[in-house]
Amino acid sequence: MESGSGGGGGGGVAALASFIMNEEELKRKQREKLKKLQATGGNPRPPRSLFFFTLKNPFRKTCINIVEWKPFEIIILLTIFANCVALAVFLPMPEEDTNNTNLTLESLEYIFLVIFTLECFLKIVAYGLLFHEGAYLRNCWNILDFVIVFMGLFTLVVDTINTIAGVPTEKGGGFDMKALRAFRVLRPLRLVSGVPSLQVVMSSILKSMLPLFHIALLVFFMVHIYAIMGLELFKCKMHKTCYYQGTNIIAVREGNEKPSPCAQAGHGRRCTINGTECRAGWPGPNFGITHFDNSCFAMLTVFQCITTESWTDVLYWINDAMGNDWPWIYFLTLILVGSFFILNLVLGALSGEFTKEREESRSRGEYQKLRERQQMDEDLEGYMEWITHAEVMDGDSEALLLLRKDTDSESDSLYQMLDQQVIYFYRLARRWNVVLRRKCHVWVKSKFFNWWVLLVVLLNTLVIAMEHHNQTEGLTSFQDTANVILLACFTIEMVMKMYAFGPRAYFMSIFNRFDCFVVTIGILEIILVVSNIMTPLGISVMRCIRLLRLFKLTRYWTSLNNLVASLLNSVKSIASLLLLLFLFIVIFALLGMQVFGGKFNFPDRVIQRSNFDNFPQALISVFQVLTGEEWDSIMYNGIMAHGGPQSPGILVSIYFIILYVCGNFVLLNVFLAIAVDNLAEAESLTAAQKEKAEEKARRKLMRTLPEKSEEEKALMAKRLMESRSKAEGMPTTAKLKIDEFESNVNEVKDPFPPADFPGDHEEVEPEIPISPRPRPMADLQLKETVVPIAEASSFFIFGPQHKFRKLCHRIVNHTTFTNIILLFILLSSISLAAEDPIDPRSFRNKVLAYADIVFTTVFTIEIVLKMTVYGAFLHTGSFCRNSFNILDLIVVGVSLLSMGMESSTISVVKILRVLRVLRPLRAINRAKGLKHVVQCMFVAIKTIGNIVLVTMLLDFMFACIGVQLFKGKLYYCTDPLQKTAEECQGTFLKHVPNSLHDIEVHQRMWVNSDFNFDNVLNGMLALFTISTFEGWPEILYKAIDSNAVDTGPLYNNRVGISIFFIIYIIIIAFFMMNIFVGFVIVTFQKQGEQEYKDCELDKNQRQCVQYALKARPLKCYIPKNPHQYRVWYFVTSCYFEYLMFFLIMLNTLCLGIQHCNQSDHITKLSDTLNLIFTVLFTGEMIVKLIAFKAKGYFGDPWNVFDFIIVVGSIVDVVLSEVDAALEARGGLWCLHGCAEVNPMQAIAEAENVRVSITFFRLFRVLRLIKLLNRSEGIRNLLWTFIKSFQALPHVGLLIVMLFFIYAVIGMQMFGKVALVDGTEINRNNNFQTFPQAVLLLFRVATGEQWPKVILASMYGKLCDAKSDYGPGEEYTCGSSIAVFYFLSFYILCAFLIINLFVAIIMDNVDYLTRDWSILGPHHLDEFKKIWAEYDPEATGRIKHLDVVTLLRRIQPPLGFGKFCPHRSACKRLISMNMPLNSDGTVTFNATLFALVRTALKIKTEGNFEQANEELRAIIKSIWKRTSMKLLDQVIPPIGEDEVTVGKFYATFLIQEHFRKFMQRQEEYYGYRPTKKNADEIKAGLRSIEEEAAPELHRAISGDLIAEDDMERALEAGEEGIYRRTGGLFGLHTDPFSSEPSSPLSTQMTSQRPLQFVETRLEDIESPPDSVFLPNTEFFPDNMPTTTNTNNNANFVEDMSSRFTFENESLSAAATRNYSYEDIRGSSSYVGGASSVDDRRLSDFTVRTNITQFPYNPSYGPSKNQTATEASPATDKLIQQALRDGGLDSLAEDPKFVSVTRKELAEAINIGMEDMEGMAQGIVNRQSGKVTKRKRRPIPVPPGTKSTKPKENTSAV
């Protein structure tokens, strides 16, 4: 037995082992198979390759084996890597020189080429070349390989030919060999095809190119428009500069000042240096590259400006050339639209696409893992079951018993052998060990220990931060000692934790591993220092690792800990992106070396630091372009290296543009996507932990209250939840949801009068609410609650009932008083801006001083009044208890103090004057919307705390490392030849270029760099400027040149040190700064959703519902006059649109041909073409005016825009012609012969007239903007643009206030600094006037050279000659506060406000990357446009029959699309279920709302009436001001027996169903059965239950399957189903009968005239037999039709009397088919109604008090049957069948049951009375049984999926 069981067990184990081996083998084979498939692109190998090699060919077999051999792949990757190294080592030299290394590398190139060619050949033989799936060239990466190999071979062939022909190799015999060899740099791209993770990133980038197409188009379009505007405005303006008279030497004041344009007259820069003149002949700024002389250069300049790099230089040059009156408008709008909006669109689209792609790949990975786990579980489960059955378990249990006995005997013998005392001590030691570990564990977990560790960390930080340049020896030794002590503390902490938790548990935590690493490195550092093994540099870097201990702080701060953890996790996701970024940089660096290597050597200029002379330098240069800092200057050098702007060298700008666009716009924005992803993850982590902590607290509470009753416990839990919601409520007021900043969040977009939406008249609390959703601004401004007089007395004099106090109360709370105070605040703000900062004694300042007294008096009176009313500060509710009132008090107090002190030189008075700038802040307390925004911003700043802290920690760490590396090493002597401070004394001679005086004497000075690392604070400031990408190359090159402490720089001394800066930029600038943007976006989205978290609608649903509720129909003017109609028809046709589009494009090309110094022929041609286009566009305007008349024409904003452009263009043409005619007399403004008086004046006047004429020439350019209206994609982007600005009113106001305050402070503090050319405070950039100050701040906000502005504003700068400085105080202007001033402004602007703008754009641009099949607000405008064609007068109603055709003209997801069958359309209408008016019309809002509701599945499930009520409640809660009338229109309330489209079209489906039922009967019997028995009724009832009900059910719930419907419709067409007469539309005359009226004419009256042609086309598209059409009823020609549609009662009676004729007309009607359009277009559509406008559908009756009948009157009671009579038994059976089908609500509708009864009777060919008798018999037989039987399963046709209808479903 034992052996048997043992054998069984062994057999089971062996079987399990063999099974696992088989499984492993199977998996291995599957992997190999998958790899082979991947190698061939997922396709099987072709049977033949190159038409010759079959699969069995031994040579091909060998090729396949080699290619699919893993080492082969590794060899190729290594070869690519080696090739990259060879390319990097290559040293390009000027003038095509070379050296031995380069020659060796050239010969190595042949080896690489042979290897790559061989690989290519083997793969082509293995997989075939091109003509079948899986061929070599069918894979994109292989195409890249093939091109690279081909170009290499081609280069080799050309080289060989040249060598044979004796042509020098490099000249290439006509071929540019350098260009061909440049293809070699693409070889690193082959690494992408070898690394799968790179392929994923690359593929997702390529995939995201699609949504970027429209944005790229918009960017190009915007650049083109601004370029042509620049061409018109600034052409030929930048070629004059100041020359010394009689020479070609350009005059500049300082050696470092760049030459600038000048103006001979007018407002431009004058030449002020003695002996200089302003004349033409200068190539222009940047070697003649930056100008607007032709469209290409203008586009390059505009592109450079929208990258915000050197845009102010271009603006200042234009100002110098033309004056600074208006060019700033051009550049500011360019930056706002181009840089802040359009480039952020790129960011939004990219990040959305990447997030989507990452989400998809994550989902795919999770799904794959789940499948594998399920498969493994299934295999294991099956096999374990098999083993369990095979094994005999008893044997195992016996074996275990034997084993236990053996163990016991062994332990007994052990006890006997060992001494008892040893055992005792061993046990005692173990016990003590357990006790000590437990105590140690408690100690380590205690708060005291945590605080001790934190204290040690902070001390460690302080010791490191104390280090600085020129520190004392004592401090150094103290730091060394402290380091050892602190290291010992950290070592003790580590050992204690390791002992308390055990090594395994200790190393489970990532933070503990991190601690261990830091401590180990610290110990290693001390050992190396003591033993003098390592260099000091290495030691200093290792010391900095101690700084990582700072992150120990985060473990005690949960949310910060989670943030750090998520950032560490994101390193994995960043790795592949960084690899791609590195590959991208390497490729462009290698390409740059090929194109620019050794060419950046210009004889007349200093050495260019950013160059491509070697690989490390090329990498740095490419990285610099990638960050966007001074990328334009590198581009200019590249252009000059290839011959300058006049040669084809200008084409190298393409290299830099592609590098900038791909690197900066695309790759760097992916960091943002990753940042947003990981932030969301950190947020969810924190939320989950919060939830966990609350749960723990709740459990603890319950445990502490065991004796309390259940009710008390519930009450306590409720209180806990309330306290939680309050705690959470306050932070969530950080509503970065910008809708909150609108004048009203939900009503702002309503363009209609508010009469339709009466507001709820409740009083609104104006203070910030505690609830998660702040009140909308309009609500806050509707009515302010008046604060009553407090019970306490004020000033101990005025009691609560005192008359004076009551009077003051009335005054203070009066609206007029508030408005007056706001007006005075505005006036005082204007007076502050109008002050002259230079001369305090100027007349203007004296006048403003008196005004200041008036303002101060008014504000003082206001405060006194308020204190009188509310009391000063002693009691609750008093004036000083409000923080905003304290602000008011401070501002007024400051004004009073500054009035009392006279001298402006006293620093206290200066400060007090500066503090007056806070006056505008007083407006915040009065404008409630603005107050709310400010409060939200403060809370938002609190929420960013964690990110700021992490960034500051990192910045601090890098600053400490910087101090270790660079302290005292960035000093230099002004004489570059001297290297130490001792040598740097005395004077030296300096040659001045471009000067008449060749040599100048300068004083030697030993100076420090402006941004240095001498201490931690300086280091943090330097690093912060680097993180903003401003001026970092300058700091980098100073660091590279740094030598030793207190020693001057050596050129390229430490190139490797650049790694420090690059790592810092990647970690901080690329990643952490994007985290800021990401955090604002995440907070914005989270808070936006938070406010609606309980309303059950997501954001998209809310936007669409809001649109549907607020939209109003558009008026569509259609002329009555036939001639005018023809013009209108032509103007509204698409051909006219295409013609105008073509003309605008032609006009664009014609505008682009202009250039500076163009010939007279070009000028004449340009003017002639302009005249022609002006005539054409004037013609367009006239034609449109004829078509639409003035009212209709000017109703469209685009037409108004056209009109302005045409008028401006006509003025332009007239002025140009007049000016040309008067040219001989000096032009337009010199009619009185000013040329004779003063030639310079003539030039000035001529320039002025050019400006005037040029202004009107702008109208030519503005025509291009009309193109924006032509493209759907660009229209959508414009929609985003408008939406973004719509969301910014109060935020915009906040930005204006911020700029105003900072501008006025800047004027007071830096206004006296002298304007010195060559510095950053100069004639174009200063604080001397308010507009200049605002422009300077705007420059700082864009980040343009802002660190240099700080340096130019620091204390010790030269004062302006007009200012009131004393003797010897010439250099006392500026202020040390400049650092704080500019830093705070830059941080507020760049990181908060501009990011807020980015967040809004990203929120509005999400539709670009969203699934296009999801309905969004941008789809809904189309509905309004097409509705207008059916309802030109904008009545808001159309016939319900028009709805089908209207919706078929709108493409999905909003409409049905033109290919949607009518039957499917009718079923969609059932689910839409709009209320139907008595005249057969539906309303605009109800239809749009129903479309939105069904498309987005808003409350369409479950009981329909209940869903309606829930939706009504949601709408009331979100859109409180929606009128009840509108709400009843879109969602009828319960209890109203409304006629709805759903009920109406439900009868269609019942009728269609019975027609099919009859057809089946005919097919079954071959004829209409005459046998009448109960089985027939049962069959009909069964068909209702099993066929009609499920179909209706699906239609009601909107669960339609389009393909299924299409198939059924086609089947119906093939079976030849004919439309039977009778029905729902009442009496219709045959449209093809011999009636004199034409269907065409009637259509023209009932429908938009444009549609009378299109209707027939739709009929052709949808074959009549395949489409479900309404049934029509025909009568003999001699039957008179009813014309009095106004008397519907008679009409019903008349119809009832004719009911008997129906069967007679059956056979005749069944032989004809009529289209839906024929019916709705026929003149007899409503029973012969003569007036279409007054007609009523015959399907409706006038409502009476007795009854209303919603359906066709012919289904109503006949003459012999009163309205109250019925067929109870039949009705009962039909109701039962409907209920069994899940249509309870239809079963309750007597009218619907009546319709169904009649249809059933007709279908089984039986009279009503007979059917009732049989039905009664069925009911009698069923009596005593359960009435509601179990539903039978619905038979499903083969090959289709069964859709089981839900129980208890909704009503229609």
Curated annotation (Swiss-Prot):
Record topological domains on the Cytoplasmic side: 1-70, 128-139, 196-214, 352-447, 502-509, 558-576, 676-815, 871-882, 928-946, 1082-1134, 1189-1196, 1272-1290, 1403-1852
Regions of this protein lying in the Extracellular compartment: 87-107, 156-176, 235-326, 467-481, 529-538, 597-651, 835-850, 902-908, 967-1056, 1154-1168, 1216-1252, 1311-1377
Protein source organism: Cyprinus carpio (Common carp)
Residues covered by region (Disordered): 1820-1852
Residues covered by region (Dihydropyridine binding): 1004-1093, 1358-1424
Function of the protein: Voltage-sensitive calcium channels (VSCC) mediate the entry of calcium ions into excitable cells and are also involved in a variety of calcium-dependent processes, including muscle contraction, gene expression, cell motility, cell division and cell death. The isoform alpha-1S gives rise to L-type calcium currents. Long-lasting (L-type) calcium channels belong to the 'high-voltage activated' (HVA) group. They are blocked by dihydropyridines (DHP), phenylalkylamines, and by benzothiazepines.
SMART domains: Ca_chan_IQ
GO cellular component, one term: voltage-gated calcium channel complex
Name this polypeptide is given: Dihydropyridine-sensitive L-type skeletal muscle calcium channel subunit alpha-1
Processing and modification events after translation: May be non-phosphorylated.
II repeats (start-end): 433-679
Renumbered ranges of IV repeats: 1121-1405
Span list, region Phenylalkylamine binding: 1370-1413
Keyword Methyltransferase: no
Expression sites (tissue/organ): Skeletal muscle.
